């Protein structure tokens, strides 16, 4: 069975000497993933975006409720 380009090499006399080599494109993708989806700035951005969405939903509900329950 072939894996997706990763190769495992081991020394048959020592099971502690195992190395895993990833293809270069995979390590680039991991670097991009780590830069885009992790980190303090990204977490703060996600929190700010979710708070903004909640405020917009609250305002939309308030306006909708105002016009639905308006006596007149």
UniProtKB/Swiss-Prot annotation:
> What's a single GO BP term from this record?
nucleate erythrocyte development
Does the keyword Cell inner membrane feature in the UniProt annotation? no
In the bilayer, the protein is annotated as: Single-pass type II membrane protein
Q: Where in the cell is it found?
A: Cell membrane
- Main role? Regulator of red blood cells formation.
**Family designation:** Belongs to the SMIM1 family.
Q: What is this protein called?
A: Small integral membrane protein 1
